[in-house]
Amino acid sequence: MTAHRIPLSDLEQGIPFEQRHIGPDSEARAKMLAQVGYGSLDELTATAVPDVIKNAEALELPGARTEAEVLAELRSLADRNQVLGSMIGLGYYGTFTPPVILRNVMENPAWYTAYTPYQPEISQGRLEALLNFQTVVAELTGLPTSGASLLDEGTAAAEAMALSRRMGKNKKGLFLVDADALPQTIAVIETRAEPTGVEVVVADLSEGIPAGIAEREINGVLIQYPGASGAVRDIKPLVEQAHELGAVVTVAADLLALTLLTSPGELGADIAVGTTQRFGVPMGFGGPHAGYMAVREKFARSLPGRLVGVSVDADGHKAYRLALQTREQHIRREKATSNICTAQVLLAVMAGMYAVYHGPDGLRTIARRTHRYATILAEGLKAGGVEVVHGAYFDTLTARVPGRAAEIVAAAREGGVNLHLVDADLVSISCDETTTRAQLGAVWTAFGVEGDIEALDAAAEDTLPAALLRTDDYLTHPVFHQYRSETAMLRYLRRLSDRDYALDRGMIPLGSCTMKLNATTEMEPVTWPEFGQLHPFAPAEQAQGYLTLIRELEERLAEVTGYDKVSLQPNAGSQGELAGLLAVRGYHRANGDEQRTVCLIPSSAHGTNAASAVMAGMKVVVVKTADDGEIDVEDLRAKIEQYRDELSVLMITYPSTHGVFEEHVADICAQVHEAGGQVYVDGANLNALVGLAKPGHFGGDVSHLNLHKTFCIPHGGGGPGVGPVGVRAHLAPYLPNHPLQPEAGPATGVGPISAAPWGSAGILPISWSYVRLMGGEGLKRATQVAVLSANYIAKRLEPHYPVLYTGPGGLVAHECIIDLRPLTKATGVSVDDIAKRLIDYGFHAPTMSFPVAGTLMIEPTESEDLGELDRFCEAMIAIRAEVEKVGSGEWPAEDNPLRNAPHTAAALGGEWEHAYSREEAVFPAGVSAADKYWPPVRRIDQAFGDRNLVCSCPPLDAYDD
């Protein structure tokens, strides 16, 4: 018998999840607190966080649950979702995710825990995968340049509208939209157009541009191909007519259909947009999925989002990188026409690998089978006396059944199949990769007809017009032909992931990015079919599990932030910003204050802030930042007075982008409110606030959150993300809504921000699980440890590198900025040199030169244990000693391990003529040969890649370098 008998209830609990999520245990935290000079976490945060913003009470959240309990709760929610056969279509289709891709990409932390490939030398695997994706999109659309993903089809179409505005000839003209476009796409375009003054006209374009519209100035035209109704028509005459009128032409195209149909590029399109969801990505109740955009060459340098290109490294070997980054919002700020940054990399990788796995022949077979099912279904309906509206279609047909549509849709539902109710007389039916013979039979039964599949198969003919059949070859690169066996595919995926650095390998201390644990328990339910295979427009009664989860997550996020209402629709932080600013705009306009259009933004703000403000129809006015990193209060006061009658909103990040808790934040908010403005608190740094302070209580009217930062959704190598927007009650009537799901938002809302009603709903179980696993106290402790870890690093590095900004008590928030400018001035060693040298030490670099050029911003998060924090600190201290050797002349300025970093395994072979040893190059202080990370390439020549733009798969020999 033991001296102390543990109660059964304690034994049943096991180790709390909090101890799995938070890296430093109690003993380690005591050591860290001693280093920082505090006796407890409460004492530390009592000093760091200004009194005026502190929570008066604990978070009112359900208590923490064990991992087993949370999985059981999620299983109960999942069981309340009914997964019927989906034949709704409208841009979302059933698809089979090849298990080798599901297990080795979607469920693999080597892929889903990576960050955006800003450090290309340690991102070669996913950059190659994204190049595959770009090649698939470019070749299927017949356009030379494709981006590395957008957020969804609706936002891609809206981005095409903005690109047309920027690049088109008739810049003040209207934007004409095909009435047969997807309804959610039309709605997103209208939401995005209104604030910027773009007139959108929706018209039937089946017979060309109507005369009354053709007489007007047209900036751009968007055509759906095939149409939402299923119609396949020759759009070339329409494209030619639009071009004659000086318009830019965008075609929203189905990639699977393009394996059989003439490409948009060949038909004359300038831009092609769409979604790659049906290339192996589960529907997920609306997302996440990778949208796409491909463009003609003259538009390439204005393409929104990320673009992967081919360059060379220091040895002249082929290497991949993000190209033309000066296009992006973090560079262009208020001059940007898009706020897209992180998009949908993980899903783009999956879609690209789907094409690699199936190859062009496999994709054609899937497309032909899908089309055959549609033709058999149509012939059976026609034989039973049902009118099929269009004679040419790919996968979708529309049936006319006067007065019977609702009855038929209900009968099909009873038979286990969801159809799309168009109106009282029309029913739309879509086939896909997962369609079965039994589903065809269920549809016929619902219509009251019978069909013999074998007989109809023998008689049915393809309906695609001969003139539109694709004749050119595509996906001819060897990568789309050499991985047919699962063994080969498995090894290809492993080779690529081994080239990358992700959280499964080590800490990623990127400031303002919050690269914390994405726990397996949180991730596991995402691929359950009850969550993954539900169509976003399925009837609400079939999605009760999802709707309950969504409501609970919204309520819990509202409690955490102090807001009254939260919308989960925005599928990225950038879209959350836009949604929040549109809510502010809607509020002012409802009050008759249309003149309130000025948005005040500190000079240190995230680049998306300014870009989003412009997209919301606002005028950006920059507020100075003081020498201590805080907002220049005097300049702010002056700007408030100058624009008092025009002031719409102040956008601030809290804690600030300089990594400190600003003491005057409540006073700043009060000044803006007194002048009639609203306060937008950017939630990028919420990981320093949860459980300690609530933006909605210290003056914020609206915030977006980043569930892919604070609430554990993985970054996926550059997406997916979720950017919910939280608002005070007076702004709630102006949150996003959706035309196809009334439950998704208020009737008075600004319209949809995303194509799907609840955005990337498929990954919301991750954040729901995190909050449930941690409980209110656990969330608070996670925040406190995040603050402790940042201060621990700051204290350890301060003797070697100046910490640029501190707040109350000389403390930082959850991140710290170290100033390398004095070192660079004295030695010539740049911030880039130190970032690349960290690779040799086995680390991803911190954030470079943001928000201050020549600095590193370090955010360790609460998930890294003391051993990893110390390993990073020791690497930085060792690098500081290396910089001294350069400064003293012991190592030449142009030939030292910093200037030549990173070093590859290939560098060890052959002659060695450097002023430092091989060991100093690849096994610097503290680096073990046993678990060394070897970068696959040396430093990449960024300028070469932009001068020689190549954005699709290079010749095969490049893969062997």
Curated annotation (Swiss-Prot):
The glycine cleavage system catalyzes the degradation of glycine. The P protein binds the alpha-amino group of glycine through its pyridoxal phosphate cofactor; CO(2) is released and the remaining methylamine moiety is then transferred to the lipoamide cofactor of the H protein. Its EC number is 1.4.4.2. It catalyses: N(6)-[(R)-lipoyl]-L-lysyl-[glycine-cleavage complex H protein] + glycine + H(+) = N(6)-[(R)-S(8)-aminomethyldihydrolipoyl]-L-lysyl-[glycine-cleavage complex H protein] + CO2. This is Glycine dehydrogenase (decarboxylating). GO terms for cellular component: cytosol; glycine cleavage complex. The keyword Membrane does not apply. Gene3D superfamilies: Aspartate Aminotransferase, domain 1 (3.90.1150.10), Type I PLP-dependent aspartate aminotransferase-like (Major domain) (3.40.640.10). It comes from the Bacteria.
